Amino acid sequence: MYIVCVSIIIVCIWGCLGNGTVIWLLGFRIQRTPFTTYILNLAIADFGLLAVDFTLEIRWLQNRKQDEGIVFEFFEDIFQCMYNTGQFLLTAISIDRCVCILFPLWYRCYRSPRLSTILCALIWIFSFIFPGIHFILFLTAKKEHKYIRCYQYIVNGFICLPLMTFSTLILFIKFCFKTQRIRRRKLITVILLTLLFFLSFSFPMNAFYISHYIFESPTLHRIQYGYLCATLNSSVNPLIYFLVGRPKRGKPRRSMKVILQNVFKEEESHPDETAPSAETKL
């Protein structure tokens, strides 16, 4: 447990630095687009999750046991809110890219530029519902608060997992059958890698929580490994942006700002992606 806890703390520090850089650049240094609104909110959710988890792990190192009480439950519910937000945002991102690929003409001509902002606001509000109910029930000493998180993870599993898996498959199939020019697009590569890492790292925590509340299995060790997977998932996205967006060998190095611009402003500089679909419909 000590090794896992220290590993989580190291990953949290690294992830906070990466996501903090993304938040600073996308929020204040780079002109925002509808799609980068999703990425900015995702970075905020990941940063919040890592900061809260860092606090929880420090408290565990001090006490060497599972913390309890109002302070712990408050931070735990904030963690759950950030975790929910990340899941729903990635689901929205995957659906957004699928619509962009399957219906490119409609996406460019009729999609509202404010849609991403509205969806992000709704996702944040919805993500607070289950943790908020859990904290209120905890304060009123209701035993039902123990099962709220189980319901939360069941809802996440039935909503996010099928939609994200289906969208990832569509994106992967389209990516494989596109021309070499489109296949080299960095944005679709970033999205696919982000979704694959999320499906690999983030959903084990759903399984750990559901198995605990349904089968009443011991939690501490399993939940710690779930936290480790969640922190890895929240920390890996800035690294993906950097590795995919960096220039090839032999070319001069670029700043992180230029790398993010190359990755997330790609769809604006490639309007010809919709040409085949438009010509087919005409």
What are these regions (language model features)?
Residues 30-35, 67-70, 108-116, 182-187, ...:
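Membrane-helix interface segments
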Residues 5-12, 25, 48-65, 79, ...:
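Helix-to-loop junction signature of class
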Residues 40-43, 117-121, 151-155, 188-196:
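Internal alpha-helical transmembrane segments of multi-pass membrane proteins, especially GPCRs
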Residues 166-203, 207, 259-264:
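Intracellular effector-coupling site of seven-transmembrane GPCRs
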Residues 1-12, 32-93, 98-103, 107-110, ...:
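Extracellular TM2-ECL1-early TM3 structural module of rhodopsin-like
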Residues 102-129:
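The cytoplasmic-loop to transmembrane-helix boundary for the fourth helix
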Residues 1-20, 60-61, 74, 137-143, ...:
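Extracellular N-terminal segment of 7TM GPCRs
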Residues 199, 203-210, 219-280:
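Seventh transmembrane helix
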